[in-house]
A protein has these predicted regions:
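Catalytic phosphate/metal-binding cores of nucleic-acid and nucleotide-processing enzymes, i.e., regions
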Residues: 2-6, 45, 60-62, 83, ...
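Conserved inter-motif catalytic segment of the P-loop NTP-binding fold
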Residues: 3-4, 65, 76, 84-172, ...
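The Walker A/P-loop phosphate-binding site
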Residues: 5-112, 128-129
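N-terminal cationic and glycine-rich segments that engage phosphates or anionic surfaces
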Residues: 151, 195-199, 293-298, 307-309
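Phosphate-binding/switch region of NTP-binding enzymes
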Residues: 163-287
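Long, well-ordered amphipathic alpha-helical subdomains in the mid-to-C-terminal portions
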Residues: 276-305
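Terminal-proximal interaction/regulatory segments of ATP-powered molecular machines
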Residues: 295-342
Length: 342
């Protein structure tokens, strides 16, 4: 640097002075406190665009319209944590926890910690205590359900701008909760979109204000896509013919290696969530591990006519399915593929 010789302190001295300052704690850029791991969704399309899932010690926001798959996706993160022997916490502000459905989604509800707070303040304490105790993941369901205690202090509860209170409370909660992520847990908030009024063009917003987006390290937007119908009932408007819907997921923000602004489609069925075999087959097609020509599908030395045929084959041959899963994960996480699988 110019004129460095004329300065009283050398670069090394300045470096050591800053690191040893007891008033403000500083570390080197390679300190282990910055290291993190990820919690996989174990839904290959989502793991692909996030490069392995959501980061621990960070804040993730899942938002979108009603019945668009947000809570189901969050439940799969909890399922992954439980399978790894960790602790998952669900803060049920909407009072919508359904043990039967969560069990059907793969959760061990006997090992789930569930809070039912009535106010934002109670929710804050539940989340803070969970993170400080070392919980692996804490789900807030949802931001739209946050009710500041001040709402209850007014007899009428009307005319006191509760929306502004909610936004202020949520942003203050995040200011105080983000530092608690140093304990190693992942904080995940679910939020819902709302239509704005008074604009020429309808625009979406969400409870809690725009400030919450700046706190996020990972932000995903969910919408409900096309209906999945029974075989031969394509295009039917009869509800009895609908088996599920497509979850459209877009990664809007990711500070840890995700494919930002990428959108994926996940087929979701009412009776059992996601058919993982079919899902991996579809992702393997995208990765070039399985080849399709017209109605024919080719994998290694085998060929199949139609999607149902190849999916059924993998369901009946667990060894081949495990190899497909390993090859697919390797491809979308590292960009490498096994040549023998193509």
């Amino acid at each position: 640097l110019p004129n460095r010789g004329k300065m009283k302190s050398t670069s090394k001295e300045i470096f050591n002075t800053l690191l040893n300052d007891k008033k403000v704690k500083a570390t080197t850029g390679n300190d282990t406190s910055f290291e993190y791991t990820k919690i996989p969704f174990n839904i290959p399309q989502l793991d692909k665009i996030t490069k392995g899932g959501i980061p621990r010690k960070r804040f993730t926001l899942l938002f979108g319209g009603f019945s668009s798959g947000k809570s189901y996706v969050a439940s799969q993160l909890c399922k992954t944590v439980q399978e790894d022997g960790g602790v998952a916490v669900w803060v049920d502000l909407e009072k919508s926890w359904d043990s039967d459905w969560m069990t059907k989604s793969g959760l061990n509800t006997k090992e789930m910690v569930v809070y039912n707070p009535d106010t934002s303040e109670e929710a804050f304490k539940a989340v803070r205590n969970s993170l400080q105790a070392g919980a692996d993941i804490v789900i807030i369901d949802s931001v739209a359900g946050l009710v500041p205690a001040d709402i209850f202090t007014h007899e009428d509860g009307i005319g006191h701008s509760p929306i502004a209170w909610q936004s202020r409370t949520w942003n203050q909660m995040l200011m105080r909760l983000i530092p608690e992520l140093k304990h190693g847990g992942a904080l995940v908030a679910i939020n819902q979109t709302r239509g704005t009024m008074g604009n020429v063009q309808m625009m979406d917003t969400m409870p809690g204000g725009e400030g919450q987006k700046y706190f996020t390290h990972c932000c995903m937007h969910f919408t409900r896509g096309s209906w999945l119908t029974k075989p031969g009932k394509s295009g039917s408007k009869n509800m009895s013919d609908r088996m599920g819907f497509e979850i459209n997921a877009r990664l809007l923000k990711d500070k840890f290696g995700g494919e930002k602004f990428e959108q994926v489609v996940v087929p979701f069925k009412f009776d059992g969530g996601i058919d993982m075999v079919e899902t991996y087959v579809r992702v393997a097609l995208e990765e070039g591990i399985i080849e399709q020509k017209g109605a024919m599908y080719y994998y290694k030395t085998s060929n199949f006519r139609g999607m149902n045929a190849i999916v059924t084959w993998f369901k009946e041959d667990s060894k081949e399915y495990e190899e497909l899963v390993d090859a697919t994960k390797k491809s979308y996480l590292t960009g490498e593929s096994d040549s023998e699988s193509a």
